[in-house]
Regions:
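Charged phosphate-binding loop/patch that engages nucleotide di/tri-phosphates or the phosphate backbone
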Residues: 137-171
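Conserved N-terminal beta-strand and adjoining loop/helix that marks the start
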Residues: 5-30, 52
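Conserved Nudix-box catalytic region and its N-terminal flanking loop in Nudix hydrolases
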Residues: 25-73
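Short connector loops at helix/strand junctions that flank enzyme active sites
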Residues: 16, 44, 101-105
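Active-site-adjacent beta-strand/loop module that shapes the phosphate/pyrophosphate-binding cleft
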Residues: 81-117, 129
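A short coil-to-beta-strand element that immediately follows conserved catalytic motifs
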Residues: 71-83
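NUDIX/MutT-family hydrolases
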Residues: 106-150
Length: 171
């Protein structure tokens, strides 16, 4: 009688460092996607580093492509140079090594010229919507994601002021 040998790959834990990418248009329409494992949980693109030495911009571009089908290299990906540290929800801690309860998240923005077609990864997300930034901030399940969307409006206004001042047009 032949025995059946099964091989289980060892559990690969998530690295507790991630990115959040607010995808938006110049007129501040924001793309939100709904998680497949949590109906009603709307969010921006998020994801963890695949390796400790993976550059953050590479992680951001990879996650955008995986979750939406959008190729970040075709548009303007900006590192917001903003980092937060938050407690990992208890229901998701099993994805991390024992004792890991906090995650460091780096914020990025991806500006597309208009709402672009989205191809969702059905195992991760079930629906998407382009919303005005205020409505998007209200829809976000996570308070930190909502804050990132609210910062988008501030960053856009600050960027316009910087460009005006640099051009010598300020009065």
């Amino acid at each position: 009688m032949l025995g059946v040998c099964s091989y289980r790959r060892p559990m690969r834990y998530k690295i507790p460092e991630s990115v959040l990418v607010v995808i938006h248009t110049p007129d501040l329409q924001v793309l939100l996607i709904e998680r497949a494992d949590r109906p009603g949980f709307w969010q921006s693109v998020t994801g963890s580093l695949d390796a400790d030495d993976e550059p953050l911009a590479v992680t951001a571009a990879r996650e955008v492509a995986e979750e939406t089908g959008i190729l970040a290299a075709s548009f303007e990906l900006t590192d917001w140079q903003h980092t937060i540290d938050y407690e990992i929800y208890p229901q998701w801690r099993h994805r991390y090594a024992a004792g890991i309860t906090r995650n460091t998240e780096h914020w990025f923005g991806l500006c597309v010229p208009e709402p672009v077609p989205v191809t969702l990864a059905p195992r991760e997300h079930t629906r998407f919507e382009w919303l005005p930034w205020q409505a998007a901030a209200e829809r976000c399940f996570s308070s930190s994601n909502a804050e990132a969307v609210r910062q988008l409006a501030w960053r856009t206004q600050a960027g316009q002021l910087d460009r005006t001042l640099a051009g010598g047009v300020a009065r």
